[in-house]
Amino acid sequence: MQTKRLTTKPTHEVIAAIQALDLTSVKARLMDAELGEGWTQEYADSIEQAYKTYLTMLVKYQEHAEDIMLAKDVDEFWHTHILDTMQYAHDCEITFGNFLHHSPHRRTGTAAEAEKRSAAAALTRELYAREFRA
């Protein structure tokens, strides 16, 4: 199976664009106790960095992008980023050169799905360890 590339831009340019993203409005919404999650500034900042790291991993390891897993709060950050569709589309265009679709893993409850999730989790740990020597 051939995996669609997320971008044709040079990796270093995409990573620089990811790091330059202004996600202040995303964090503000997530810090709002009524509209968001009531996160602290410190926690929102840490999840913003984790989100940018996740996007970087997708670009650096495009051949595995469909299998790289993300933490629940990073996924929540991504969902909140997507809510402002115009800004998200703009951010995707300047960062990746195209729209980055969110395709959540669908749970079927089958043994095959559990095995695939387990393999994806192992791959994610391996790639993060390779990248960050953790």
Residue spans of the language-model regions?
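Intrinsically disordered, low-complexity, repeat-rich regions
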Residues: 1-134
